[in-house]
Every structure is written in structure tokens, then in C-alpha cells.
Amino acid sequence: MSEPIQRKLILGSTSPYRRELLARLRIPFEVAAPDVDESARAGETPQQLACRLAMAKARAVAAQFPSCVVVGSDQVAELDGQALGKPGNHARAVAQLQQMRGKSVIFQTAVAVVCVETGFAQMDLAQVKVNFRQLSDAEIEAYLRAETPYDCAGSAKSEGLGIALLDSIDNDDPTALVGLPMIRTCRMIQAAGIKVLGA
């Protein structure tokens, strides 16, 4: 009886944060950039947007590499039911953090795993509730000058100095806030045929 094929793993993302998280598994993988329009659709909730984009990213890369197992992920920060995107610049980051101070923000982090050749396709969503402290304008300014998190949904990096902005974090998948829920990702890539612990 022949050994099952050990498929190649591909991360469908250019995010350095997701790459670093997946590398923690100590299994080989490649990175490919998904060509996906990330615009929200009319009436789409932040949760729906994160799920749709995670699957779209995985499918876009899987179409180029049909024999591989592809991981796609997306994160949308949600405040009062509205999506907060990546700020992109200092002024927008200041505005986001001013909006979020003293409030709870839900980070919707979706992950999808796809293999075209086997027909495998799964998706899951991790919701992280982040409670922000009542921040002063001076604290916001000092944080942004120190860490420049303009490429992060919600204008903060919890894995760095951004932790000082928070009162508490409530979730069941610790890395979800950084951009890739690794408990869910491990479960799905193993179901797709990737050996994580060599067993």
C-alpha cells in the first residue's frame, strides 16, 4: 500500500504577521500573493466580509496551485457593527484609536483552507473581543509614533506595544488577534492532509 501524498502547503497572503505565525509550526510552506478585490459589498457585515475574503484568497491561490493545500485568511475590526479597515496613514490611525478608546472592538479573523485537487474546502472564524482603555490623545500619539501600525486593522499591534492600549482580550484562539487563528488553522490543514507533528 502506497503512502498518501504529502501535499505542499501554501500561505495565500503577503502579510509578514501571518507568515511568522505559520512558521511557528516548523513545517515547510511557500507564500503566494492572492489577487483579490478586498472591497466590502453593500450590506455585508464585518463577519461576512472576513469570511468571504478568506475563502476568496484561498481559492485564488489554489487555482494557481491545484495540488497544494492553501491557507487564506482575513481580518476585519468591527466597532458598533461597522468595519474598520487598515488606517494606511497617521491621521486615520489617530481617528480610529480615538473612536475605539473606552470601547469594545470585535476582531473578526477568518481562515480558509482549500485544495482544488481533493475538493477540500473549509472555513472557520475566530472572534476576538478587545476592550480598549480610555486613552488620552497624548497616549494615542505616543503609541502611533513608536509603532506605526498603519497596516493593521484597528491601528494597533497587540503583539507589541499595542498591548498597553488594552484593558482585556477575550478569545479562544490566542493568535487570532495577530491575524491567523492557529488552533483552527492546525485543525484544518491536518484535515486537508498536512502532517503537523509528523504523525
From Swiss-Prot:
GO cellular component, one term: cytoplasm
Molecular function in Gene Ontology: nucleoside triphosphate diphosphatase activity
Chain positions of site Important for substrate specificity: Y17, Q75, E159
Reported cofactor(s): a divalent metal cation
InterPro entries linked to this entry: ITPase-like_fam, Maf-like
Cysteine pairings via disulfide bonds: none
Statement: the UniProt record of this protein carries the keyword Ligase: no
Compartment annotation: Cytoplasm
Gene3D superfamilies attached to this UniProt entry: 3.90.950.10
Active-site residues, as the UniProt record annotates them: D74
Catalyzed reactions: N(7)-methyl-GTP + H2O = N(7)-methyl-GMP + diphosphate + H(+)
Keyword Methyltransferase: no
GO annotation terms (biological process): nucleotide metabolic process
Similarity field: Belongs to the Maf family. YceF subfamily.
Purpose: Nucleoside triphosphate pyrophosphatase that hydrolyzes 7-methyl-GTP (m(7)GTP). May have a dual role in cell division arrest and in preventing the incorporation of modified nucleotides into cellular nucleic acids.
Protein name: 7-methyl-GTP pyrophosphatase
Species the sequence originates in: Albidiferax ferrireducens (strain ATCC BAA-621 / DSM 15236 / T118)
Highest classification ranks of the organism: Bacteria, Pseudomonadati, Pseudomonadota, Betaproteobacteria, Burkholderiales
